């Protein structure tokens, strides 16, 4: 619980058999998590059994892709505050406290992995990933007149229940570039949001998305294409985010 609000953590898994059990246990150990929901997205053999050894609830999403799994998690989670994270050991469960602190004033809290002092030795944050994520984030800032953003690829984030429902209803991207879509849906909904630094650790195992520079570059290009298309269909009146629950464009 965070105050009087229930906290759900959603973990989407595909290739995290070696780490998922310890990550689930780590989130419960924080003392603020009421539910850990694991979305099994056609995960490697043995993953489901690892999850069953924990108190986590597991659901199965057959449509392959980060976007499909995230949407399922947002729909299935029962909490008032919903935290998305990776079960690969790259994020510290303890950092959930940072996100929760800002949930008292914000509808969305996005993590950023671009603070050098919090990037651990061996973490997969080479210069092209760090600066690439930064550049795409600045593109969103410029096109959507937003608050400060520095990392579109960070998947450690928090949404309120109302905002999670709105995002799940409007999501269209099923693949690995769904992260910026969720961010853009939050921005254009009028949600109040903030970005905060989180720790970034070496991954346990190999990533199917960013383990290869070529794949990471391809995902980045898909993100840029998505952002440009999203901007083209967004009315100018929606480029000054307002408080969630008010008419877009009214401001605070």
Region spans (language model):
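Hydrophobic helical membrane-anchoring modules
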Residues: 1-4, 18, 146, 170-252
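Acceptor/aglycone-binding surface of glycosyltransferases and processive sugar-polymer synthases
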Residues: 62-64, 68-76, 94-172, 203-213, ...
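A conserved acidic beta->alpha catalytic loop
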Residues: 40-48
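Cell-envelope/extracellular polymer assembly enzymes that use nucleotide-activated donors
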Residues: 6-8, 35, 181
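Donor nucleotide-sugar binding loop of glycosyltransferases
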Residues: 16-19, 43, 66
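Short aromatic/hydrophobic "clamp" motif used to bind/position activated sugar donors
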Residues: 82
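Acidic donor-binding/catalytic loop of UDP-sugar-dependent glycosyltransferases
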Residues: 46, 85-102
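Short, well-formed alpha-helical segments that are part of the catalytic scaffolds
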Residues: 14-29
């Amino acid at each position: 619980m965070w105050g009087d609000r229930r906290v759900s953590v959603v973990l989407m898994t595909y290739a995290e058999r070696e780490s998922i059990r310890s990550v689930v246990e780590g989130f419960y150990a924080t003392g603020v998590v009421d539910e850990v929901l694991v979305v099994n997205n056609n995960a490697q053999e043995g993953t489901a059994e690892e999850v069953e050894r924990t108190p986590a609830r597991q659901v199965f999403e057959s449509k392959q892709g980060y976007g499909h799994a995230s949407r399922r998690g947002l729909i299935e989670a029962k909490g008032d505050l919903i935290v998305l994270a990776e079960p690969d050991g790259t994020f510290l469960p303890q950092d959930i406290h940072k996100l929760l602190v800002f949930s008292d004033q914000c509808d969305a809290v996005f993590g950023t992995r671009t603070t050098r002092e919090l990037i651990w030795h061996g973490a997969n944050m080479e210069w092209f990933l760090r600066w690439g994520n930064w550049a795409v984030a600045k593109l969103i800032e410029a096109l959507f007149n937003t608050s400060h953003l520095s990392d579109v690829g960070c998947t450690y984030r928090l949404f309120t229940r109302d905002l999670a429902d709105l995002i799940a209803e409007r999501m269209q991207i099923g693949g690995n570039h769904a992260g910026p879509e969720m961010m853009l849906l939050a921005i254009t909904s009028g949600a109040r949001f903030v970005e905060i630094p989180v720790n970034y650790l070496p991954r346990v195992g190999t990533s199917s998305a960013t383990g290869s520079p070529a794949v990471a570059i391809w995902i980045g290009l898909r993100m840029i294409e998505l952002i440009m298309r999203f901007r083209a269909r967004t009315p100018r009146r929606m480029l000054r985010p307002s408080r969630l629950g008010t008419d877009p464009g009214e401001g605070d």
